[in-house]
Amino acid sequence: MIPFWKKTGKHSKPQSAQKRRQNAKPAVPRTAQQSIPMQRMFEDGTCRVKPNYYTRTIQYQDINYQLAQQEDKTAIFEEWCSFLNFFDSSIKFELSFVNMATDSTEFEKSIRIPFQKDGFDDVRAEYSQMLRQQLAKGNNGLTKTKFITFGVEGESMAQVKPRLDHIQNDLLNNFHRLGVQAKPLNGVQRLKLMHDMFNMDGASKFHFDWKDLVKSGLSVKDAIAPTAFAFKNSRTFQMGGIYCAASFLSITASDISDQLLKDFLDMDSSQIVTMHIQSVDQNRAIKTVKRTITELDRSKIEEQKKAIRAGYDIDIIPSDLATYGRDAKALLKELQSQNERMFLVTFLVLNTGRTEQELENNVFQASSIAQKHNCNLCRLDYQQEQGLMSSLPLADCQIEIQRGLTTSSTAIFIPFTTQELYQSGKESLYYGLNALSNNLIMVDRKRLKNPNGLILGTPGSGKSFSAKREITNAFLVTDDDIIICDPEAEYAPLVERLHGQVIHIGPASTQYINPMDINSNYSEEDNPLALKADFILSLCELVVGGKEGLQPVEKTVIDRCVHVVYRKYFENPTPENMPLLEDLYNALLTQDEPEARHVAAALEIYVKGSLNIFNHHTNVDIHNRIVCFDIKQLGKQLKKLGMLIVQDAVWGRVTANRSAGKSTRYYADEFHLLLKEEQTAAYSVEIWKRFRKWGGIPTALTQNVKDLLASPEVSNIFENSDFVYMLNQANGDRQILAKQLNISPHQLSYVTHSGEGEGLLFFGNVILPFVDHFPKDLELYRILTTKLNEISEGAQK
């Protein structure tokens, strides 16, 4: 093992006059601007740090390394090793991890729901209060960002630009292979980053425009420099109103854990962790190791000679010598045959505090983390300014303390921990707190490729509450229409509070929906009747029943009659001409096939009998923004039929809204009831697929995962749902879901005997554990809850 590499100067070649001028020590800076070690920033993000040295910076996002399965962790680690091996000895690079306190006022403003003077501002105020309470539980006041900065030498910008472009594109592709989102920073973004690092006290806001440089005669440094640097003592310094201390990590552990970097980044204070990494030319590294082995062998021979002269066994040599010899030979083998390279690493930590005591506490915490991993955090005595400037994302290390590490040893500082889900935007909704970081989860399902969603969980796990919370949030911040299919009469209090419309469908109700309703937008094809016929076939399958469902001849006669009964309406599309189930019944009776009379006989009870509630023209105006279909009174015989008819009514609303450019959110509780009959399941799956194209955002709630995966066709609902809100799961369902969604055992623990409002969120390719403990002292909670004791308590108040 080669622990440290030192820069040699003893046998170096004589330097030219130009080189001597470039390497001459700069004059002591007289201003804060002069302290900043950069010369020029270009608009494309290229920075000339010093003569003939240019750098660029890429910002990258986190991925879920800590939650991944072991084989996935291994794959990420190996891919990161390949990422590091990409850099040859001509490229210097730096990994920067910047944790900075966000202005709490600004952050609260970003989550506050603006008033709209529509009669619901009191609800908005209470929902914003809930968000502030949840924010206080986490550390969202700390913004964590990650960057990689790389630099190459060249005589001019024109010479280095093609190479920088090439390296940048390769790095972006390498990040893409890791599943990491990354973007290069332009000049303004790099300047803002450095401004924020220099002005952690928040006293100065960043204002910069390229056009102002020429007029004002100022430089870019004037836009980023703090009010002052004060390097008054050897161990700390002041930067604006912040106290700081720069330290380096002495890596003395024989075995480094992949948790070391994570533990540093989990600290709840503003800090900058920096890793400067320089690849060593492979031939030079191998020669150096061989030279070290030769020197160790020479020392071993000397020790053996001493042993002979002293008259003791020549195999007894100092243990350190034997250990170093084994390590050096193992290192040589790795470099020669195991795709390992040698890197020189400088690991820096810049701690901050608003007072000297707070700074010392933060440094002590960082030192404890280092000691926990058998390393030492050493203060950069008399090098605080160099430590600060080396922490800037400029890939310019001014600290000459380097540790030699192989690719694998360097890659163990894995820069990925926990992915966050926080999307800023008007329509981002709240889904709880990240269980790993306690940060708010705020996302907009419309940004997904497929916004369809599932809410899964055992009874009492919080399915209905989660759906109601999302409905409330969507109602308050979006213009979307919201329709609910409510088989258990749970949503009426919320809908009424939001001045919505509750439609009670049951034998004793006088509110009717005509399942034969159709509009010209019903299908994107020229013939909307084809999709309507598919729905009516599904309806007849539920009516006729039987294990085999509808027979081919029965399907044929039903389809024939559908075209007959709609003929009059399409000739003159008025509400009076809209057909009823009775028209279909009569048309079936006119057919010659006995199968037609069989279907008509099955339909009779729904036309002339006691279950004729669906044989009426629609008499409710379902154009309210939030509509709830309460089908609890339908009973078992009619509930599936009612759910199917509601689904069709929703489809009609979705198609009408599409032409108006409006989204429609649909919530279907007890969704598994629609998946037991083949034709009905097939129709539901087809509608599920169509929703996305037409601006629909359906959400299915169910406790029966087995029904969702009962057939390959039904399992398409999973494949067409990029949003899954998974609460506590029964044992059998857990195993099914683990296989279907590739959930690791560690991830599965978050839905095993979990409490209410706790589970896993699947958002696109991101999997996050969440916790949503909604404050119970709010009026909104009493409206959302389905617990009888809490509902009765709320009524008494």
Give the label of every model feature segment:
Residues 63, 70-89, 96, 100, ...:
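P-loop NTPase motor domains
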Residues 466:
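Hydrophobic positions on the alpha1 helix immediately C-terminal to the Walker A/P-loop
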Residues 2-418:
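Extended, folded cores of ATP/NTP-driven motor/assembly subunits in large transport
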Residues 473-483:
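Post-Walker A helix-loop "phosphate-sensing" segment adjacent to the P-loop in P-loop NTPases
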Residues 499-503, 713-726:
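A short helix-turn-beta junction within AAA+ P-loop NTPase domains corresponding to the substrate/partner-engaging
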Residues 455:
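Hydrophobic anchor at the beta1->P-loop junction of P-loop NTPases
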Residues 741-796:
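Conserved P-loop NTPase
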Residues 463:
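Conserved lysine of the Walker
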